Amino acid sequence: MQAGGEITVYKMTGKDLKAYMEWSAGYFNSVKEGDVTYSFNLDRRSSKYSTNDFFAGVTYTIDLTKPAGSRITDLHFADGKPITDTTPIRIGMNSYRMGHLTKVGGVLEGRSFPVLFDTEEEFGEDEGTIRNLTIRYLSEVKNGKYEGKPMNRWALSGLEGYEKEREIIKNLINSGEISVPKSSDGRYTNVASINVKDKMFQNEEELAVYLSQLEKEF
């Protein structure tokens, strides 16, 4: 959703939803044997527009051992009911985002979806924006107080094996001793996975040299 616009509810099928979700999951790079970190596709990471969408009301796993377009698994409604290609879906998003999805070249190009509800029509052009509806909810329903909590709606899978090496790399990243690879211009981070297959680093300096060489590829 975009912060400044409205929320429109559209009717689609489970097949449409999964196509949309697969497109979003393409934001991640595929996992290769020896990878100990997940990473992002450089073209998507550096795009002018946000293309990393997440989904509420459902639970799912993104299996990064599979190629882009075939990664969404275990797709269910929040109540545990499985979602199939023919399952009726009501999905809420900003109309600007829907336009991006259905335009020429978009993942849902050529498809049209009936509008079931539009917050601008219901509440007005100003009061029907996501921003003002959120303000109204927080002030009128939550009395100005909101405590966030993890929703645990989705998960990544694919990093298997190399547990010892992964733990070492994780600790080095979290301590700030090393960083994940970034693009050559330094603007975009985590554009490649750290891979330890057939690599033995005698010290942190050797690891730093490897990471520097990896960044030069981007």
Predicted features and spans:
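Catalytic centers of hydrolytic enzymes
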Residues: 1-218
